[in-house]
Amino acid sequence: MGFSDLLNPQNPESTPSTPANKSSAPSTPSTGQSNSNMTSVSLLPPLMKGARPANEEPRQDLPRPYKCPLCDRAFHRLEHQTRHIRTHTGEKPHACQFPGCTKRFSRSDELTRHSRIHNNPNSRRNNKAQHLAAAAAAAAANQDNALASNAASMMPPPSKPITRSAPVSQVGSPDISPPHSFSNYAGHMRSNLGPYARNSDRASSGMDINLLATAASQVERDEHYGFHNGPRGHHIFGSRHHNSNRLPSLSAYAISQNMSRSHSHDEDDMYSHRVKRSRPNSPNSTAPSSPTFSHDSLSPTPDHTPLATPAHSPRLRPLGTSELQLPSIRHLSLHHTPALAPMEPQPEGPNYYSPTQPHVGPSISDIMSKPDGTQRKLPVPQVPKVAVQDLLSPGFTSVSSSASNSVAGGDLADRF
């Protein structure tokens, strides 16, 4: 049997074998040969890759009207063409509907296969996604709580009218935010902190030196208002006022700052000039402090000399021989003074030079106004003709000394 016989099993030689099998028994060898031929034909389609079953041959002849405009492929159905075009364009219209999943697919069967991951409770990917979502939610909640606690701890005390009242029990814990009544907050500071008590919880609760200085200034102001009404004992901060060897107290520091500035309740202004101050109860502190005003004598002169000039020092002016006294506190400006005080001339007082004093010789303006250039010369200074009393007079001292000590004045005297 040749290869052509295998491809064409329905040849005329094999057709009579079937009737012979039914009619008589002597045709048994032909029947066995025909069975071997059918077995070879049944095994042939798996061996031949290009061959198709006989029942699919009519589909190969069906028309393919739906052709891809981007390539040479054609399809029987429109949805097949549409699905194929998405491979060229990259369109993925099928999105996953599971919350938190952002995957998209171009085919609906891919979406169905992907949805089984979320629907299967035993999936490792599903458990991992749930753990990640829970961890992200917990981290966001912790961050919100931390921001809220920081905002509450850094909240300044409210600026309300101050009234004396007893402390309330709600301010017993240092970890809570400042209470609604500032007087209760001041009473809590007066009763629980003690004279310069070092509390380890103060740093963790956000109560920095600004809040303590404000509270101490309130206590000091209340004690100062009731000082003239009757005899009062020394309060808890009073022991630091009369000891000049120690650093000034916190309440006196706050009062000295408030006396030179306006008594407004602007917390930004109150905090701006206390930022770089060191802790007053530190024994090794070297930061300069402001002058401390005692209760017994509210004199304009401080109890001790500061290491640096405060920001509210009086404006500089030339001093004479008869007055070496600073102005009183009432003459100081109550407004916010700049860091560098401007040097403004102040005409009042007997120690300043006045233009009413007599001049010797022509003035500089008269010399410069002369038309002739040869006459524009400075006259020879007549120093020997001035009396000794005029040199020692307070009105002439500042002018003559400044003119004689200057380099330009010495050059003019040597020139002539």
UniProtKB/Swiss-Prot annotation:
A zinc finger (C2H2-type) spans 66-88, 94-118. Residues 280-294, 398-408 have a biased composition (Low complexity). GO terms for molecular function: RNA polymerase II cis-regulatory region sequence-specific DNA binding; zinc ion binding. It comes from the Eukaryota. Residues 7-42 have a biased composition (Polar residues). It holds the Pfam family zf-C2H2. It is found in: Nucleus. Residues 1-66, 107-126, 153-176, 258-319, 339-378, 395-416 are annotated as: Disordered. The keyword Repeat applies. The keyword Zinc applies. Ubiquitinated. Deubiquitinated by creB, probably to control its activity or amount. GO terms for cellular component: cytoplasm; nucleus. Gene3D superfamilies: Classic Zinc Finger (3.30.160.60). Its main location: nucleus. Keywords: DNA-binding, Metal-binding, Nucleus, Repeat, Repressor, Transcription, Transcription regulation, Ubl conjugation, Zinc, Zinc-finger. GO terms for biological process: carbon catabolite repression of transcription from RNA polymerase II promoter by glucose. InterPro entries: creA/MIG_C2H2-ZnF, Znf_C2H2_sf, Znf_C2H2_type. SMART domains: ZnF_C2H2 (SM00355). Residues 54-64, 263-272 have a biased composition (Basic and acidic residues). PANTHER family: REGULATORY PROTEIN MIG1-RELATED. Belongs to the creA/MIG C2H2-type zinc-finger protein family. Transcription regulator component of the regulatory network controlling carbon source utilization through ubiquitination and deubiquitination involving creA, creB, creC, creD and acrB. Represses the transcription of the alcR, alcA and aldA genes by binding to a GC-rich region in their promoter. Also plays a role in response to carbon starvation and the control of extracellular proteases activity. Interacts with creB. This is Probable DNA-binding protein creA. It comes from Neosartorya fischeri (strain ATCC 1020 / DSM 3700 / CBS 544.65 / FGSC A1164 / JCM 1740 / NRRL 181 / WB 181) (Aspergillus fischerianus). The gene is creA.
